[in-house]
């Protein structure tokens, strides 16, 4: 946004203050409304501080529309009632297509629209269509272009004064743009919270160990109705204008769509997802179009709103009870509903993740009947205090998997039972384990478990694993679904006739796959270890294991302490490796794989023990960037001195060498009381000064 106005000197404080307010409001509009920031943060802060100082030195220069007034006033003892000059009416709702057709017919009949012999309207009604936001309705009052008051809907006649809180919403202008502004303007609109801002707010709530909000609407409503505006100022609220109450000093726009265009010219935020359509079919087309993009919108909506576009026709139609005859809210199917939780089972994912699943009494929600819903993980079940027998809130949004949001505690029966995570996989019977610091429990039968079969086979065939060319996902799907392959070992039992019968698999493709399988029988120990798909064991760790132990049996039988001696193997990785080989089902598949005629690799002696040095038996972790040494240089020097260089910090770590931009490893070392050294300290350590 261009800033062509000349910068006034500091010797003219009144002119300077007005100029600063203008610059800051332009920046706010570009940032919060247009989403096109054109002033660097540092420059904005400098101008803001200068304006604060000017107003402090000259209190008579403070104006209600000053950006400095957004920070909020003193804590209020309560909200003052506000009587609306024009009532804030609610809308009648429609749900089915027939409701919309009936609404259009009522409007057309009342306006005397002409129809043909079949009863169809030949002069269709013109409608303005908008989104129905899932937020909190408010009224903004501007006098001569300056924001003076904000109030909630309340009962439609009397609301609550939330002026100081609304001042903190950056997308709401404190002064309207343009030379011609009305004497009085009541803007009607919605305060809401965008999905990304809601997620960030809940992250902050969790970090501060404060209550999280259930959904963006609750967060917006709770934030707006804070007694302390300073709290509201910390909440990322937004606003969209969509209606009008009172207008004095200027003529009312002829159409609703013209009103919204005028609002944009005044600098008010207006949503762009709107259209002018004709007749019932136009309304239904808009509804379906919005429904298709609903989940991708950055904010929650619960429907769309239809309004007769022409103001004179609105006046002719008037009102019934507390709702306008000229408008209708077309609601989406409810996304949340109540039902009974009858049981909690678990399902096993492709990677072995064990997910608790709620078994529900059937409930219609989000346009479909739901009988199962995810509970995510054991910790979530505990955090939400969900028990078998509870009445629960189920949410289903679009194609998202239904989830249980929470329990209705005042309906909890006396015999409600807590969930207990099973100790064995319900699919294969292998042990279920949960590693420290992980939220997900997992089945340990990676090579054996049918639920993990496709993922295990796909990983086994990868280029960096056994490199079985021609064994893609579609072929794996067929092999598993036809029950031809249960474990990776079964791949080497496949014959030409079996493969040639697969769908869209020609004889040449079958022969090529057999050739690839034959080639894959001759591999390396590192590739074989990587192909097993052990959690947390990547290509590099597989190479380190092969180099350290020399052969497979010592790895399979290693203790956790022995695994921790391997380069870059920390406690979590060691525990994962140990669990994998402790599962008898996995050992059985490995024996099948290395049976005569199957997979082979050259084996050798374990790597020689590192020479005894000044750091023999010590474990060191490197983090951050050292001034003069690369990570590899430092690692080589430490290993030459007999130290083990680990990739993660644990209680068994002896030293942490920290450079610039050290992250979580440094924080964990400090929390555990582990000595932290810089590059100079590293050199002293290598010289034998272990302090």
Curated annotation (Swiss-Prot):
It catalyses: NAD(+) + (deoxyribonucleotide)n-3'-hydroxyl + 5'-phospho-(deoxyribonucleotide)m = (deoxyribonucleotide)n+m + AMP + beta-nicotinamide D-nucleotide. SUPFAM superfamilies: BRCT domain, DNA ligase/mRNA capping enzyme, catalytic domain, Nucleic acid-binding proteins, RuvA domain 2-like. NAD(+) binds at residues 41-45, 90-91, 130, 153, 190, 307, 331. One of its GO terms (molecular function) is metal ion binding. Residues 610-691 form the BRCT domain. GO terms for biological process: DNA repair; DNA replication. CDD domains: BRCT_DNA_ligase_like (cd17748), LIGANc (cd00114). The active site is at residue 132. It comes from the Bacteria. Zn(2+) binds at residues 425, 428, 443, 449. SMART domains: BRCT, HhH1, LIGANc. GO terms for cellular component: cytosol. Its EC number is 6.5.1.2. Its cofactor is Mg(2+); Mn(2+). Keywords: DNA damage, DNA repair, DNA replication, Ligase, Magnesium, Manganese, Metal-binding, NAD, Zinc. DNA ligase that catalyzes the formation of phosphodiester linkages between 5'-phosphoryl and 3'-hydroxyl groups in double-stranded DNA using NAD as a coenzyme and as the energy source for the reaction. It is essential for DNA replication and repair of damaged DNA. Belongs to the NAD-dependent DNA ligase family. LigA subfamily. This is DNA ligase. It comes from Burkholderia multivorans (strain ATCC 17616 / 249). The lineage of its organism: Bacteria, Pseudomonadati, Pseudomonadota, Betaproteobacteria, Burkholderiales. The gene is ligA.
């Amino acid at each position: 946004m261009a800033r062509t106005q000349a910068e006034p000197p500091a010797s003219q404080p009144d002119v300077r203050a007005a100029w600063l307010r203008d610059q800051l409001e332009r920046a706010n509009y570009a940032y919060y409304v247009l989403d096109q920031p054109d002033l660097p943060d540092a420059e904005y802060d400098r101008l803001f501080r200068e304006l604060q100082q000017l107003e402090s030195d000259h209190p008579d220069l403070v104006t209600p529309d000053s950006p400095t007034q957004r920070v909020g006033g003193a804590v209020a003892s309560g909200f003052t009632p506000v009587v609306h000059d024009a009532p804030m009416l609610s809308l009648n709702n429609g749900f089915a297509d027939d409701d919309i057709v009936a609404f259009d017919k009522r409007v057309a009949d009342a306006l005397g629209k002409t129809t043909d012999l079949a009863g169809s309207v030949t002069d269709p009604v013109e409608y303005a269509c908008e989104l129905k936001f899932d937020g909190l309705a408010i009224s903004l009052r501007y006098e001569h272009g300056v924001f003076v008051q904000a109030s909630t809907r309340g009962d439609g006649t009397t609301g609550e004064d939330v002026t100081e809180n609304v001042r903190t919403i950056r997308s709401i202008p404190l002064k309207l743009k343009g030379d011609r502004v009305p004497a009085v303007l009541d803007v009607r609109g919605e305060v809401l919270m965008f999905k990304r801002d809601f997620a960030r707010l809940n992250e902050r709530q969790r970090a501060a160990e404060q209550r999280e909000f259930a959904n963006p609407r609750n967060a917006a409503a709770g934030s707006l109705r804070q007694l302390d505006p300073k709290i509201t100022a910390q909440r990322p609220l937004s606003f969209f204008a969509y209606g009008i109450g009172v207008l004095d000093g200027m003529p009312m726009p002829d159409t609703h769509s013209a009103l919204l265009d005028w609002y944009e010219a005044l600098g008010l935020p207006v949503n762009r997802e709107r259209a002018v359509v004709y007749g019932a079919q136009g309304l239904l087309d808009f509804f379906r179009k919005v429904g298709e993009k609903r989940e991708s919108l950055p904010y929650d909506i619960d429907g769309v709103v239809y309004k007769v576009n022409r103001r004179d026709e609105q006046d002719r139609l008037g009102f019934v009870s507390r709702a306008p005859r000229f408008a209708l809210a077309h609601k989406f199917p409810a996304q949340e509903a109540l039902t009974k939780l009858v049981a909690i089972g678990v399902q096993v994912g492709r990677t072995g993740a064990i997910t608790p699943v709620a078994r529900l009494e059937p409930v219609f929600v989000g346009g479909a009947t739901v009988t199962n819903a995810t509970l995510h993980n054991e910790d979530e079940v505990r955090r939400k205090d969900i028990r078998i027998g509870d009445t629960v809130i189920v949410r289903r949004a679009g194609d998202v998997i239904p989830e249980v949001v929470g329990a209705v505690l005042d309906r909890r029966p006396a015999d409600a039972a807590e969930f207990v995570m099973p100790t064995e996989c319900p699919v294969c019977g292998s042990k279920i384990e949960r590693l420290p610091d992980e939220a997900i429990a997992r089945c340990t039968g990676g090579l054996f478990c049918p639920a993990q079969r496709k993922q295990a086979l796909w990983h086994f065939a990868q280029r960096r694993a056994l490199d079985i060319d021609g064994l893609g996902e579609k072929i794996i799907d067929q092999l598993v679904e036809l029950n031809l392959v249960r474990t990776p070992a079964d791949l080497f039992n496949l014959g030409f006739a079996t493969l040639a019968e697969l769908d869209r698999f020609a004889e040449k493709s079958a022969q090529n796959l057999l050739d690839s399988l034959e080639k894959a029988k001759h591999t390396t120990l590192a590739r074989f270890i990587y192909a097993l798909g052990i959690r947390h064991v990547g290509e590099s760790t597989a190479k380190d294991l092969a180099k350290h132990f020399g052969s497979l049996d010592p790895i399979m039988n290693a203790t956790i302490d022995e695994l921790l001696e391997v380069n870059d193997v920390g406690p979590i990785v060691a525990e994962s490796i140990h669990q994998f080989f402790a599962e008898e089902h996995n050992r059985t598949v490995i024996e099948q794989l290395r049976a005569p005629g199957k997979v082979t690799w050259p084996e050798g002696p374990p790597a020689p023990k590192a020479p005894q040095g000044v750091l023999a038996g010590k474990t060191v972790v490197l983090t951050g960037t050292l001034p003069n040494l690369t990570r590899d240089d430092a690692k080589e020097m430490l290993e030459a001195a007999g130290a083990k260089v680990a990739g993660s910090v644990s209680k068994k770590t002896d030293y942490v060498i920290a450079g610039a931009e050290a992250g979580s490893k440094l924080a964990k070392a400090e929390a555990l009381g582990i000595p932290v050294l810089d590059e100079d300290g590293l050199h002293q350590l290598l010289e034998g000064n272990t302090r």
